[in-house]
Regions:
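Conserved G1/Walker A P-loop phosphate-binding module
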Residues: 92-173
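Conserved C-terminal guanine-recognition region of P-loop GTPase G domains, centered on the G4
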Residues: 185-251, 559
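Canonical P-loop GTPase G-domain recognition
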Residues: 232-285
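Extended helical scaffolds that flank P-loop GTPase cores
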Residues: 249, 276, 283-452, 656-668
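Extended, low-charge hydrophobic alpha-helical regions
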Residues: 362-366, 382, 423-464, 508, ...
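Hydrophobic core segments of alpha-helical transmembrane domains in multi-pass membrane transport
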Residues: 408-419, 481-486, 564-566, 579-593, ...
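Juxtamembrane inter-helical linkers in multi-pass membrane proteins
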Residues: 434, 438-442, 495-525, 600-624, ...
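Transmembrane helix-loop junctions at the membrane interface of multipass transporters and ion channels
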Residues: 550, 554-577, 739-749, 770-778
Length: 778
């Protein structure tokens, strides 16, 4: 039988893992190895993918991938907590604290003044960025779904001069499966940090320590930070930290990054091992007496053969040996072995496979997990099923239930739109508008009383206040939307959306993981494009990048709110939701076109860990809202401010720089008039509208400020409701802003960026034309 044949609630023992290449290696690295036991927790609402519990965590696999894994059914495993004798508490010796305790006595101290660089490495969603913020005093965003960090971030350790810690994207192993894993691996191998801070989720030692074992092979000082220890002890678990240090041969520090507990001790350990270059005391995890010693002999023989090549390539010996046995072509290419050496190594590996009864990759993974099992048996009392896990299961019965998941998702999104555009956001917007209007009146009176020059007064009132002021009034709506998105992200719900939507997205050629960048795209396209780095397939990554701009970003909200309140009063929530779902629908159609033309083939398999639901932290949510509000205000007083001044100047003066009484005679009218024939079939044949749409390429918010300046607040009298609907659809779909274009260029190159601009303008024109025609019929 295969894993696909399991029924919900049944358990099985893996016999063989099929497939090949990077995906199979990823399965092995995640603990899907021969001999591992797992239980089918549930199926997604559409029947695919499947959710398994293995090594104490939840892993999702598609039916097609589960079919490649042979298994035998076993008695259903109990998920209840089995109580064993609790480990005797011992005082942690404080290894290396204050740099006074020198454990090995043979350290190689760095010269005084050497900059101490640290790599912060760990699995996805293990609290790495939380620890980075505690170490450095930074305010990097934290989320409760795998893959929040997609690029390295550097900052000095707070209170420690001449130090730098780098927050790397989360990885499950040192195998290059996705682009962000390559970033992390290359940094550790090529940038040679002075020490590694390996953060481990203490509630799931089995999965996390697989990466730890690979890091110990890197010949770089390592300190292991056992994070979330408060959850372990709070659920009747315990860890013998001293015993774990002895077995791993490197310092182990219990911490709670979220509560800032143990972080100071961790810093002292890290500084000490970096300063004295105290490398791990153990790198050999293969037992010569285990399974006849086949794996042990193979690793040591390969290490001996490649020793000279490893030194020349500046790679760690033990790491290179195990990666060559696994078949890591990137490491093999760097060593430059000749054919005789390759043949000898291949012969050694084949002999090992025969003796061990497992293929090369599975044998290495099995060796590591066997050692991890010994560590857990000797040092870890697993916590009972946590209240977070129990709570997550109860919530998932509804939010990922067969008949309730999709209605819940639609209902949640509609509630977000209604509360944002009709209740909370709209109410706060009215209050801010009243304040801005009052300030505008007072400033106008002051300028009149001071007898200020008419040109300057026009600039201030018709330019700055009309433009920037109109955009600022939409700040409450944007902050409210980000508030709800933050709640969805921090709670862990977005990861569930990926699980629920995988089968649906596969029909258009994408993976369920693509939903995460797309949902981020509702906030801003720039981080959404960067978030695609978590996707393992280049095809999926490019396709998702090209579809992300169809998810309406928050910068377009001022446009929608402006026209909806003016032309569709009382229908704000309905129109807004319609626009968002229209963007998604157009994106689906475009994806189907891409799938049959530019990106033929199927999406990569869906392998994802589902985190427990957690209550969103007030500090994290508040921090995110502040960052988004600050970004909006900075844009309002920089890009939009300059754009409004430029628009004011161009619409106030003619070609001879004489101030005009009628903007029809202005420089702007002459330039924008060239585009009028293009927009006329859409019912947008007014040069002022053409101008506002062009300014929107700089920043979407400037569309509203430009309209306010050019129409002097009388836009409702200048265009019809039919034209307003056409304009809304065009604004929804046309070219993303310059910042988003730049991020697409950075990820895909300038040709793709240019193509996105042209293609989206064409799609927007066609969609707006259809809406305009339908409006004419109705």
């Amino acid at each position: 039988m295969t894993l696909r044949d399991l029924k919900v609630g049944q358990s099985a023992r893996i016999k063989a893992v099929g497939g090949e290449g990077e995906l199979r290696q990823h399965f092995l690295d995640m603990g899907v190895i021969p001999g591992a036991e797992l239980t089918l927790v549930k199926l997604a609402p559409m029947g695919d993918p499947m959710e398994f519990q293995i090594h104490g965590y939840e892993l999702t696999l598609r039916l097609a991938d589960a079919e490649q894994i042979d298994a035998e059914q076993i008695e259903t495993r109990s998920r209840a907590h089995t109580r064993v004798e609790i480990i005797e508490e011992k005082e942690h010796p404080g290894l290396g604290e204050e740099g006074k305790y020198h454990v090995k006595g043979d350290g190689d101290p760095l010269p005084e003044g050497t900059r101490l660089t640290f790599a912060l490495v760990g699995n996805q969603n293990c609290g790495k960025t939380t620890l980075f913020n505690q170490l450095t005093g930074s305010n990097q965003h934290i989320g409760n779904f795998p893959g929040v960090t997609v690029d390295r971030k550097d900052a000095p350790i707070r209170g420690r001069e001449n130090t730098s810690v780098t927050d790397l994207p989360g990885i499950y192993s040192m195998s290059p499966y996705s682009s962000e894993e390559i970033v992390s691996r290359n940094f550790v191998i090529d940038d040679h940090p002075k020490a590694i801070i390996n953060i481990v989720d203490a509630t799931n030692i089995e999965r996390n320590m697989y990466l730890t074992m690979q890091l110990l092979e890197m010949e770089i000082p390592v300190v292991v930070a056992l994070n979330m220890m408060d959850e372990v002890t709070g659920n009747s678990g315990s860890i013998d930290v001293n015993g774990m240090e002895a077995m791993l041969g490197t310092p182990v520090v219990p911490i709670s990054a979220a509560k800032n507990e143990g972080v100071d001790e961790l810093v002292r350990h890290a500084i000490h091992i970096a300063k004295y270059q105290e490398k791990p005391g153990r790198q050999d995890f293969c037992d010569e007496n285990e399974f006849g010693g086949a794996v042990h002999r193979c690793i040591h023989a390969v290490a001996h053969l490649i020793e000279d090549h490893v030194k020349a390539a500046d790679l760690p010996l033990r790491f290179a040996a195990t990666k060559i046995i696994e078949g890591d072509h990137l490491i093999l290419d760097r060593l430059g072995l000749d054919e005789n050496e390759k043949e000898t190594i291949e012969h050694l590996i084949i002999q090992m496979e025969k003796e061990r009864g497992l293929d090369r990759s599975a044998a290495i993974a099995d060796m590591r997990f066997n050692f991890i099992e010994k560590v857990c048996e000797n040092c870890v009392v697993k916590p009972k099923e946590s209240k977070e896990r129990i709570r997550s299961e109860k919530i998932d019965r509804i939010l990922t239930g067969k008949y309730t998941a999709i209605p819940c998702f639609i209902g949640i999104m509609l509630a977000v739109f209604y509360l944002t555009f009709n209740v909370i956001g709209a109410g706060l917007q009215k209050l801010l508008e009243m304040g801005i209007d009052a300030l505008t009146v007072q400033v106008g009176k002051l300028l009149t009383a001071a007898n200020v020059n008419v040109v300057v007064k026009s600039l201030v009132m018709d330019g700055i206040f009309a433009g920037v002021g109109s955009v600022l009034s939409f700040l409450p709506i944007i902050v409210t939307l980000f508030f709800f998105l933050s709640l969805m992200e921090d709670s862990g719900y977005i990861a569930r959306v990926a699980f629920v939507m995988d089968k649906l997205l596969r029909k258009i050629g994408l993976s369920g993981k693509s939903i995460v960048p797309m949902l981020i795209g509702f906030g801003c396209t720039v981080p959404a494009v960067m978030a695609t780095r978590t996707l393992p397939s280049e095809r999926d990554r490019k396709m998702t990048i090209l579809l992300t701009p169809y998810m309406s970003c928050s910068a377009k909200l001022p446009i929608y709110a402006f026209f909806v309140s003016a032309f569709f009063p009382g229908k704000g929530g309905l129109i807004m939701a319609g626009l968002y779902f229209l963007g998604i629908a157009i994106g689906i159609i475009v994806a189907m076109v891409y799938r049959s033309t530019l990106f033929k083939g199927n999406a990569v398999p869906f392998v994802m860990e589902l985190p427990n639901y957690r209550l969103p932290g007030a500090k994290n949510v508040g921090q995110l809202l502040w960052e988004k509000a600050k970004d909006f205000l900075q844009k309002a007083f920089t890009v939009i401010f300059l754009a409004t001044i430029c628009i004011w100047f161009l619409q106030s003066f003619d070609m001879h720089l004489n101030m005009v009484k009628d903007s029809q005679d202005s420089i702007l009218a002459a330039i924008a008039g060239l585009l009028v024939p293009i927009f006329k079939p859409l019912g947008l044949g007014d040069w002022r509208i053409c101008t506002s749409l062009i300014s929107g390429i700089m920043a979407k918010e400037s569309v509203v400020s430009t309209l306010e300046i050019l129409f002097n607040g009388s836009v409702t009298a200048a265009i019809t409701t039919r034209a307003a609907a056409s304009l809304l659809v065009f604004s929804l779909l046309y070219s993303p802003c310059i910042a988003a274009i730049a991020s697409i260029k950075r990820e895909m190159g300038h040709r793709w960026a240019v193509m996105v601009v042209i293609w989206q303008c064409v799609v927007a024109w066609l969609a707006a034309f259809v809406v305009h025609m339908i409006g004419g019929i109705l």
